[in-house]
Structures are given as C-alpha cells and as structure tokens.
Amino acid sequence: MDNRSIHIEPKKSLGQNFLIDLNIAQKATHLLEVGPDDIIIEIGPGKGVLTQYLADYHNEIYAIEIDKRLSDLLIMQFPNKYYPNIHIINEDFIKFDFSQITNSQNLAVIGNLPYYLTSSILFKLFDNYNFVKNAVVMVQKEVANRLLSSTDTKLYGILPIALSFYGKITTSFNVPAYCFYPQPNVHSKVLSVSFYRADDKVPHSKEIMNMVKLIFQQRRKKLSNALESYLYSCGIDFKVFYDNLMQNQQYNILEYFDK
C-alpha cells in the first residue's frame, strides 16, 4: 500500500522538508554505490520517497526515522511480509550506533538531511568512516558550496577540511526548492561522497580534527600560549593555518604526532 498521499504535517522543530520530486529521488538513489553484500542506511526517510527506489537494490536497508508518526507510516508502507530486507527504526540518527548492525564494515548511506543538523550528521559520518563506504546526501546548497570550496576562497572552513581527511566528493547536482514540501527558502544540492578506506585515510586525523575545531572556535582571537607553542613546533603560522590549511601543512602536523 502506498501511504505517501496520507497527510502528515511537517514538524518545523525537526526541520522537515519532504522530498516530493520522484525524478530527483530516483537520480539520487542511482548515485549510491552498492555492492551485493553492502548494507544501506537511510537517514530520515520521511514518507519513503527515497526508500521506494532503494528497495530495488534488495540489500538490507535500515531506514532511521526520528519521527514516530513517519516510522509508523513507513512500517505500513513497507510491511515485513513483502519487504523483509527493509528495517524501519524509530531513532535519532545522531545517537545511532553503527556497530549494532551485523557486517557493518560496508555501509552505503543516503539521506535528505535536515538543514539545521547537516554539520552534526556529516561529522557523525566522518567519525564512523571505518563503517561507511560511500554516502549520497542532500544538503542546503550553501553547505554544499562550502564542502566543494577550495582553500583560496572565503567559503573554505572546517567542513571541507574534515572532508579532505575522510573522503572526497565525486558527483553533485542541484535540487530546486520546489522539489520539497513545504518549499524551503533555499535551494539544495545532492553530493556523492566516497570515503577513504582505512589504508587511504590521513593518519592521526582524529587528533588533527580536534585541533582544527579548537582553532576555528578561537577564530582570529589570540590563542593560548600552549597552542601557539604547539603550532610553532609544527613550523606553522596560526594566521596562515587558519586562512589556508594546505596539504603540506597537514603533513607537518603529522610529523609532529609521529615524534
């Protein structure tokens, strides 16, 4: 039974903007790289527009929805009798533990991300890079442009730095605001992210990211003597580091960690 026509009022508190364009949904799901043994994680399936296309893969699918109204609707739409591979989980994705999934080393993640939680969700994926193989995420166009920005632009910041440690964007396409209900005031973009495997990931990325977060929290304020000394020992000027974090500087820091 198709329950997508059932009206459920979107919750502003959850940042709900339901994707209603089936062509966009199909195009996004086709970007997901799924092997025969991979497990699919869908973030915030809403009314199941993406889920219906994911079902064609016949892989195990975990659709994680925080809104119980929607998770109940999805259970009716994808009953276990006909969709034994689709598991509807009423839970906050931010709190979801990937390790509870059997064979969770090869996860393909997809989702239309709430704008206000985009950074938190992306950092959760970065922190769990060892589980995630690839991800297709729909985000606010402004956030996408930041992720796609180069080091010599004002958009460059902590998100593209983090992405450079854990993976890279391989494909992207624009999504107009009218493809959603309710229609947001901004446009969106779909990004396909390929995550590095353990051997390809930058060493000490967790330690470096902790330091980068501290630096961006400080902005251009004077840092503590300890952090200034830390950067100096890496041969890095703080202002240059903040404005233009280049790959060779990252490896200067790696040498510091390897001492």
List each language-model region with its residue ranges:
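Catalytic cores of RNA-modifying enzymes
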Residues: 1-214, 218, 236
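C-terminal lobe and adjacent flexible extensions of AdoMet/dcAdoMet transferase-like proteins
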Residues: 214-259
